[in-house]
Amino acid sequence: MRERKNFWDRNAGLYDCFMRKDRAVYEKMYELIRPVVKDKTVLEVATGTGLIAKHIVKAAAHIEATDASPEMITEAKRGNYSAKLRFSVQDMFSLPYASKSFDVVIVSNALHIVPQPEKSLREIKRVLKDDGVLIAPTFTHAENSFPGKIKAFFMNLAGFPLHSKWTSEEYLKFLQQND
């Protein structure tokens, strides 16, 4: 856990620049998420710099956006002018919220970088209402394309903590098995 936090603390200031290449994909994701969170109480786990939370907050009733990295949360708080959005440092394996307290939980691009993603999903299920919605998009890294292998090599070299390499089908199966 400490090693993972150190990676994200070291790279917090660069994260938004790194994510710019995926801007079009993220814009589409925001469009898809907004109607789901409309007037709902939302928890975003592993918010990073808060990109998703900041782009959907107008639709939601309230958002709690958390990350294990204090530096990521510092970056996330910059430019947050909404009283409906609160950022805090939290451990996704032990959330401080009451059971069944959120209508929607978002965990985006995070389950592949934690050592025990099924444990995180159990905690998410605990805080998600019975009729709640889990939004869990993630990058998949198991495809064997040459560009994918090159990207994985450089991510590994940079210390990126990739723990699960799923294909899209494997990821969906993982989510279904841990429902």
Predicted features, each with a name:
Residues H163-N178:
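Short alpha-helix
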Residues V104-P117:
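A short SAM/SAH-binding and catalytic strip from SAM-dependent methyltransferases
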Residues F93-V104:
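A short acidic, Gly/Pro-enriched loop at the edge of an enzyme's catalytic core
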